[in-house]
Amino acid sequence: MHSSPTSTRKQASFAASASAQPRKSISFINPSKSSAGKGYAASNPNKLAVSRTMGFLTDMKPAEKLNVPSAKTVQVLDSKGVDVTPRPLYHPDPHAASAKPNKLLTSQEGSLGSDYISSYSLYQNTLNPSMLGQYTRSVLGSSSVSKSSISTTESMSEDLEDSSYKRDRLASFTDVRVLRSTAEAAISKEELEKTIEIILTETETLRFFDLPTVMFSTESEEAEKIIEKNKKYETLCRNRLGNDLYVERMMQTFNGAPKNKEVQCEKIILEEKGVVATTWDLYDSYNIPETLLAAKRSGYSSKGSLPAKDRDPKIQDSESSSLMDIENVILAKVQEDEEDNSEAILKSDKLHQDLFYMERVLMENVFQPKLAAYRQLPVYKEHEPEEPEETLQVENLKVAEDEPKKEDEEEVEMELELEIATEQSTIPANLERLWSFSCDLTKGLNVSSLSWNKANPDLLAVGYGNFGFREQKKGMACCWSIKNPMWPERIYQSSYGVTSVDFSNSSPNLLAVGYHNGTVAIYNVQSSHNIPVLDSSESPQKHLGPVWQVQWIEQDRGTTGDDKREILVSISADGRISKWIIRKGLDCHDLMRLKRTTATGGKKGGEKEKKGEALISRQAPGMCFAFHPKDTNIYLAGTEEGLIHKCSCSYNEQYLETYRGHKGPVYKVTWNPFCPDVFLSCSADWGVMIWHQDTVKPFLSFYPTTYVVYDVSWSPKSAYIFAAANENRVEIWDLQISTLDPLIVNVANPGIKFTTVLFAKETDCLLVGDSDGQVAVYELRNMPTASDTSRGDVINILLGPKTNHTG
């Protein structure tokens, strides 16, 4: 291959400075396209480490340069014409879009014109651009071309610039930039649905303020060291006093910088008060003691053995001063003794006992007529005071004159008394109020339960507590005595309402109390302390609902019936009937768990079949119970469903019988004391029913009012008299006289509700509790009496023969 003219000119122009090494020439088959006018010269990125002498086509005209086709091939020939063109190390993608040539290796100072491109020096970096892919564009942009360094040994013309190499170079740099700035691949749906585990770890604790404690527990590990250290310090302080080993000296310490802080508080109200004491006030205050002392001194001086004239005035003055001192000491001593004695007297038990008896005597004097009527005794009349003899003589003369008149008056009085007696015999039965057990502590509380003491008929236990859950207040149980109706003998206050009370039979000093929170407590009334002897507050088997009734029951231990033991039975709203045995605390066992029952019986004609209601709880809340008076193994239980179940202590899984009749909660069930097969019940459905234990339906039903009946009670003296407490009145029924209307009706005051009734044991009196905290005592007057022989047969006559009851 022949050498181009360019090579000839290149050899001729650089002949003087050429070296002995062989020359290389570059031939362009396709000249460069349009590189003129650009102010930079491009270097071949495929050549490394050395600079070669290149010639520029400076003789070509701009017009000829414009005619050079764009495609070109670069060949490097040595002096012998051998092609030594180096192969490119980087092969760009032909399909990749060529970006605009960026001036990566150009000077940052500006661009050169075409007139100054003919000769300048290019300092090429000895680094392959393909190796710069790891660096950023700032590194690539740091290469620059100096306009001022023009070399004659190595020059290049813009016309000889290889455009293909330039394009390759720009593409390579573009690829490098694209690889660095490529965005992350899009996340697919499968990757989004994958579960990613994120582990949260605790960061380091940042302490903004740490105040070390100066107190340590005696049970801590450091307690022994601290105690030993404190002892050493104490011994050091003791040995320091008077010891020559210790010297006091001054030392400067750093005090903490004070900090002012503002705190918001309530307004401080200031008040000014002044007291003025005049000289006359002071004189009057001290004048009275001085006059008393002067009077006493005069008394002492009058008892002297020597007259005042014979004595020395100095001796008199000394004696008077000594006497004053002695008197002051004696008076002070007397006052101290009086104060000490007064405190001891007020706190003595003997004084309290004397005051207790004195109070009872005064109450009996005040309530003597009422107490006599309660005990059915004659009323004591006070004696008239005796008159002097003169007045008696005058009166005797008058009496002698008025005797005929008095006889006539006595006859008239006798006739009036007979008329009154006949009128009283025709007066119907009624209630006369005697007194009421009430005080300031019971004012406004609801009377929930009444119970007589079995050993002392004059002692009454009263429970105070509301029935409703939202009406709960503080409760109280009191023991009242008939000898003092104004104040209770014992007071047991609690945070919960009292729902039931009952005295023990074998131990009359024990009082059982049931509370609204499910606690059962036992108090000893012989003790003045208000702390219960036993309670179930911490028992794991305590009731979960209000304890509506508690009662002491004597049960047979053996088959003979002589050996009996007493247990405490309670019924609660949680559906449990439990017995409590006093051994080591309160030992609880369930007699029965009341379960809800579904209604039985076919539907009547024209009645639609009712759908079964979903049961919220399987347990039926219990409201009351009553043990059989003859067989204590059998008892009745009234529920909130309106059913009465007959149960046995030997079977705790099923009922012996179920009595249906009430439509509301059964509040009270009680056996007839003279006819043990008949019992009485009252309910919130306004009704009172009489049942026979062999028949599941009631024999008699009483609906006199449209009010709730809270309590019923049989009379202890008659088999057919009972009392019922409605909301607004108390009714006394006599089944022998009428089964339609009550015998006596006593209406309550406005705003007051009757809650409990209880007959007195030994008298014809009735106790009625109300919602205002009063227990009124009424005397039953003109009540009909039944013959003793027919007591147990009247109920059977009213209900029919027993053979007809079965079935």
Swiss-Prot record:
Residues 308-317 have a biased composition (Basic and acidic residues). Pfam families: WD40. One of its GO terms (biological process) is axonemal dynein complex assembly. Residues 1-11, 22-31 have a biased composition (Polar residues). Highly expressed in tissues containing motile cilia, including the trachea, lung, oviduct, and testis. InterPro entries: Dynein_IC, WD40/YVTN_repeat-like_dom_sf, WD40_repeat_dom_sf, WD40_rpt. Keywords: Cell projection, Cilium, Cytoplasm, Cytoskeleton, Flagellum, Repeat, WD repeat. It is found in: Cytoplasm, Cytoskeleton, Flagellum axoneme; Cytoplasm, Cytoskeleton, Cilium axoneme; Dynein axonemal particle. Residues 1-44, 300-320 are annotated as: Disordered. One of its GO terms (cellular component) is axoneme. Residues 32-43 have a biased composition (Low complexity). WD repeats lie at residues 493-533, 542-590, 617-657, 661-701, 704-743, 749-788. PANTHER family: DYNEIN AXONEMAL INTERMEDIATE CHAIN 4, DYNEIN INTERMEDIATE CHAIN. Part of the multisubunit axonemal dynein complex formed at least of two heavy chains and a number of intermediate and light chains. Associated with axonemal dynein subunits such as, DNAH2, DNAI3, and DYNLT1. Interacts with DYNLT1. Plays a critical role in the assembly of axonemal dynein complex, thereby playing a role in ciliary motility. This is Dynein axonemal intermediate chain 4. The gene is Dnai4.
